[in-house]
Amino acid sequence: MGIRFYKPYTPGTRNRSMAEFDQITETKPEKHLTSWIPRSKGRNNRGIITSRHRGGGHKRLYRNIDFKRNKLGILGQVATIEYDPNRNARIAKVHYQDGEKRYILYPRGLQLGQTILSNFNAPITIGNSLPLHQIPLGTEIHNIELKPGSGGQLARAAGSVAQLVAKEGNFVTLRLPSGEIRLVSKSCWATIGQVGNVEQMNLTVGKAGKSRWLGRRPKVRGVVMNPVDHPHGGGEGRAPIGRSRPVTPWGRPALGQRTRNATKYSRNLIIRRRK
């Protein structure tokens, strides 16, 4: 996948870059593998905003992705590589020998027509899925489960890759894309390889309108608000925040303050914090 840069025909194209779609082989999704999911717009079940700066954006059909990879012992052939508006990674449609079709995350280097397999003794090749205790040390993996049978939750974004660095007892040690090193049950499953579309991190939006297409609303700085709206607000002209450290709109410490719950059960599974 390459990156397309634009000449400054307009202010919006001056700094814009976007991914090329030369890898995409199909433009329309498989109908029975899609569903319509109402968009939350950052609201909870009571209509209260729980995640700010969300709303609007282009309509989307949700693609049902197979994160569990639980079709054991049945070979599947990669039929298409498709765009998914719900994530920055590409997806691949797999035709299995029993006639079923499923979407999976597209790993980097997977070719059309290539066969993949999910099994306890599957070969260590790109796209295959197997338990962590069956994967050799140093192997690059993605779509990793946190609990056996729950489906992949770690290393799913474009270009993400984790590495298996140790095995001991009932756990294996993983180096995650964030730099965190943590323990995961050896019975959890993972997929071999790196998630595709690795150039995603180098793209620039270019204009505010594209953020609106993606469902991202504007972010207003607290320092330009009134005191009734934000602790940083108020003052005469361009005044400083008037505090020893920045805080959230609700007065909690922000920008660098650790907010992870110290009593969370998984604290003992984290060997080194993320960077």
Swiss-Prot record:
Q: Which Gene3D superfamilies match?
A: 2.30.30.30, Nucleic acid-binding proteins (2.40.50.140), Ribosomal protein L2, domain 3 (4.10.950.10)
Q: Which GO terms describe its molecular function?
A: rRNA binding; structural constituent of ribosome; transferase activity
Domain of life, per lineage = Eukaryota
Question: PROSITE patterns from the entry?
Answer: RIBOSOMAL_L2
State the InterPro entries in the record: NA-bd_OB-fold (IPR012340), Rib_uL2_dom2 (IPR014722), Ribosomal_uL2 (IPR002171), Ribosomal_uL2_bac/org-type (IPR005880), Ribosomal_uL2_C (IPR022669), Ribosomal_uL2_CS (IPR022671), Ribosomal_uL2_dom3 (IPR014726), Ribosomal_uL2_RNA-bd_dom (IPR022666)
Major localization listed first in the record, in broad terms:
plastid
> Any one Gene Ontology biological process term?
mitochondrial translation
Localization, UniProt:
Plastid, Chloroplast
- Map out region (Disordered) in residue numbers: 223-255
Mind listing the UniProt keywords for this protein, alphabetically? Chloroplast, Plastid, Ribonucleoprotein, Ribosomal protein
Leader sequence segment: none
Which positions, given as ranges, span the membrane?
none
Tell me the Pfam families matching this sequence. Answer: Ribosomal_L2, Ribosomal_L2_C
Q: Does the keyword Transferase apply?
A: no
Q: Which family does it belong to?
A: Belongs to the universal ribosomal protein uL2 family.
Summarize the subunit comment. Answer: Part of the 50S ribosomal subunit.
Give the PANTHER family listed for this entry. Answer: LARGE RIBOSOMAL SUBUNIT PROTEIN UL2M, RIBOSOMAL PROTEIN L2
Query: What is the protein's name according to its record?
Result: Large ribosomal subunit protein uL2c
